[in-house]
Amino acid sequence: MAETLRPSRGGFLRVIGCGEFVREFLLGHGPLGSPVIDPEVGAPPSDIFFCYKRGLMRATALDQATRVEEKRAWRGKRSIEPENIEKLAQQILSRMAYKSRGCRFHSFIVYLSTIRRLGWIQPTGHEEPSAFQDHYPPGPPRRYFRLTKAGREASDSAWRNPHRACYG
């Protein structure tokens, strides 16, 4: 009897994991085309989340466009043209729904709270008014976070799965 070949349960195929993105972003490396920040100032969670989602969308669109151009070039017996890949990537990105890639904001905040519990990020003390406070003044401000020394020294495998690092 033959056993069917199928992927293992769980997980999603991502260009970069959420934890790895957070670390690289807060280090100021600007992963996936995101803006480079000052590591000492840090960034608020909403900005990190937005850059993560946009980066995943850009990477996915570029990957899809590359595959389409490869197929077209193979069928047409021609070489791959990078200009076509860029045009296709822009078309795919313009049609892609914002919610189609990555996690939702609440899941991201829970993920950050795990990273904070591990002591890998800390608030910088810098706060600014949030858009929510325009309508509800007692609402929470935008708090900036940065990496701690423990966060910089944590292993790559721990950053890939902070829940395992936290709960074992």
Task: Label the predicted regions.
Residues R14, C18, S100, R104, ...:
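Residue-level marker of regulatory loop/turn positions in helix-turn-helix DNA-binding domains and
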Residues M1-E83:
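Short alpha-helical segments that sit at the start of domains
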Residues K99-G125:
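Short amphipathic alpha-helical interaction segments
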Residues R146-G168:
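Amphipathic alpha-helical dimerization/coiled-coil segments
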Residues G125-H126, A165:
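Residue-level detector of family-conserved "landmark" positions at structurally sensitive sites
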Residues A61, W120, D156-S157:
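Short, solvent-exposed secondary-structure capping/transition elements
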Residues H126-P140, Y144-R152:
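Accessory beta->alpha helical hairpin/"wing" motif in late/C-terminal subdomains of nucleic-acid enzymes
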Residues K77-H106:
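Intrinsically disordered, low-complexity acidic Ser/Thr-rich regulatory segments
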